[in-house]
Amino acid sequence: MHTEAVGGAARRPQKLRSQAAAPACRAMPSEFTSAKLRSDCSRTSLQWYTRTQHKMRRPSLLIKDICKCTLVAFGVWLLYILILNYTAEECDMKRMHYVDPDRIKRAQSYAQEVLQKECRPRYAKTAMALLFEDRYSINLEPFVQKVPTASEAELKYDPPFGFRKFSSKVQSLLDMLPEHDFPEHLRAKACKRCVVVGNGGILHGLELGHALNQFDVVIRLNSAPVEGYSEHVGNKTTIRMTYPEGAPLSDVEYYANDLFVTVLFKSVDFKWLQAMVKNESLPFWVRLFFWKQVAEKVPLQPKHFRILNPVIIKETAFDILQYSEPQSRFWGHDKNIPTIGVIAVVLATHLCDEVSLAGFGYDLSQPRTPLHYFDSQCMGAMHWQVMHNVTTETKFLLKLLKEGVVEDLSGGIH
């Protein structure tokens, strides 16, 4: 017992001494202890290595995340472009080419009736002011004027509702334009009749061209062609109202005395307009920011260019149609941007004493009828567009018709 105790006591200090004497990372008295010590010894260095690796990986992970987000954004953008350019494969073109003869006679007779009535000075804007009260500015300038300081209303919102952060670019554009008002020969006319010619397929076959040419001011929208369709839509053009992606690509759609009224939606639109006024080529990198091909040239002299007053768009959207004001969004639209057609209708009430419409109206219950008078795109494509509230706009136009503010020559608004 004593020997064992002494032996045990003698061996225990020896074991402790050997552990104490040995360097911490070298003591290997047993397999278990060895493994444990190696684990303890390596933990600190492993933690340091892991932290270092994480630091080294952060930039590469960040780059990967950016690449992923870019690819996702590009994919969504591509899908958006495909939707915008969606065209139904089967469109009932027979409906476009056949029009009831009685309907043709009624449309032509009604157009002549409107033209033969005595013109009523200031009728349209007075009626708009009575209908919408303070939501319609009766004395609003239709085009942006060259003044020392832009109005507060012009600078309140971003394009297309205003020119906030773009005032210097607007002034630079105005410096290039020798004229900013409605042409003198039109302003001097005691009473002017406007017709806003929409792009609707309902125009095809009505043979309203002769009647439309008799209006004092004919407003056409975007790239809607005249060549080859003059029997139905006329060939007189006083104003071509559009934005870069909507401008005609063919020179034959521009006439020497046209007014080219531009709606500016985004930053690159200013660059495009500047290039068109100066008859310069648009840099390739700028073209990448448009969602479709834009015109390389607008064959008109600088005196024929105008910039639409953005307050007209603002009043049309937020005051008359009562859309919500723009909110900051990562992607998409709030459907608070009026169509060029409805904006043109409001513009016409500021320019002319009486206003008529032709080629307006979306019959969404007939998805396979032609959407435009000049192509095979179908009405069903309107279900895919994401920027405009067609239902609200139709109610607005119906209200104008009911109150007698405008006339519908083609009978498409219902």
UniProtKB/Swiss-Prot annotation:
Lineage: Eukaryota, Metazoa, Chordata, Craniata, Vertebrata
Subcellular location: Golgi apparatus membrane
EC numbers on record: 2.4.3.9
Organism, as annotated: Mus musculus
Predominant location category: Golgi
Keywords: Disulfide bond, Glycoprotein, Glycosyltransferase, Golgi apparatus, Lipid metabolism, Membrane, Signal-anchor, Transferase, Transmembrane, Transmembrane helix
Membrane topology: Single-pass type II membrane protein
Residue intervals passing through the bilayer: 66-86
Residues on Cytoplasmic side: 1-65
Top-rank lineage group of the source organism: Eukaryota
Topological domains, Lumenal: 87-414
Catalysed reaction, written as an equation: a beta-D-Gal-(1->4)-beta-D-Glc-(1<->1)-Cer(d18:1(4E)) + CMP-N-acetyl-beta-neuraminate = a ganglioside GM3 (d18:1(4E)) + CMP + H(+); ganglioside GA2 (d18:1(4E)/18:0) + CMP-N-acetyl-beta-neuraminate = ganglioside GM2 (d18:1(4E)/18:0) + CMP + H(+); a beta-D-Gal-(1<->1')-ceramide + CMP-N-acetyl-beta-neuraminate = N-acetyl-alpha-neuraminosyl-(2->3)-beta-D-galactosyl-(1<->1')-ceramide + CMP + H(+); ganglioside GA1 (d18:1(4E)/18:0) + CMP-N-acetyl-beta-neuraminate = ganglioside GM1 (d18:1(4E)/18:0) + CMP + H(+)
Disruption phenotype: Mice are viable and fertile, and do not show any obvious abnormality apart from an increased sensitivity to insulin. The major brain gangliosides derived from GM3 (GM1a, GD1a, GD1b, and GT1b) are missing. (Microbial infection) Cerebellar granule cells are no longer susceptible to C.botulinum neurotoxin type C (BoNT/C), and syntaxin, the BoNT/C target, is not degraded. Cells remain susceptible to neurotoxins C.botulinum neurotoxin types CD and D (BoNT/CD and BoNT/D, botD). Knockout mice survive 6 times longer when injected intravenously with BoNT/C; the knockout has no effects on time of survival for BoNT/CD and BoNT/D.
Entry protein name: Lactosylceramide alpha-2,3-sialyltransferase
A GO term from the CC aspect: Golgi membrane
Function: (Microbial infection) Gangliosides GD1b and GT1b (derived from GM3) may serve as receptors for some C.botulinum neurotoxins (minimally types BoNT/A, B, C).
InterPro entries assigned: Glyco_trans_29, Glycosyltransferase_29, GT29-like_sf
Gene Ontology terms describing biological process: lipid metabolic process; protein glycosylation
Expression across tissues: Mainly expressed in brain, and then testis, heart and liver, almost all tissues showed some levels of the gene expression.
Disulfide bonds: C194-C352
Glycosylation sites: N235, N279, N389
GO function terms (MF aspect): lactosylceramide alpha-2,3-sialyltransferase activity
